[in-house]
Amino acid sequence: MERRELLKMVALATGGVVIGGELFLAGCKSKDVEVAGTAFSADNIAFLDEVAETIIPKTTTAGAKEAEVGKFMTVMVNDCYEEADQKTFHEGMKKLDEACNKMHGHSFMKAEPAHRKELLTSLDKEAKEYMKSKKKEDPNHYFLMMKQLTLMGYFTSKPGLEQNFNYQQVPGKYDGAVPYKKGDKLFV
């Protein structure tokens, strides 16, 4: 799977454009100077793992936490996002926790799975409405960033790829008529 194809799939799945997509296409470049306030703590990574696990929970396949999506998000935000989007992402983590406190009376980390799902569903609707009226100069919605990074991190991870797709590590000859039955995994 090529990077462009993945970006198209993530954009279609989240109903918008991929935030920072031009940087992903060009390749991420680490900055020599770390932007003030963008360091992620172990607690931040655990928080992002829980957000990602709520979006892609463990079922018969690995969940986002098992794929270490929280760690993936931190690398992508620090190395690939512009400073404005980094700031939005960090502030968004706080906003998400505050929204959980407002909706359920406790932090996201203490919330039950049903409360987490309810919160993220409402944030997803909010993000979609925001994107309908967003102007180019407006900041991106923090939840859309988290959701896109969750999908990208999960489906490019080893457990996400191998357990959800018919992954063939060594390419064979081209066969344009591979038999496919409903319910089979996609070939990648």
Where is each model-derived feature located?
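C-terminal segment of N-terminal export signals and the immediately downstream linker at the start
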Residues: 1, 5, 21-55
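Mature-region segments of soluble proteins
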Residues: 50, 68-188
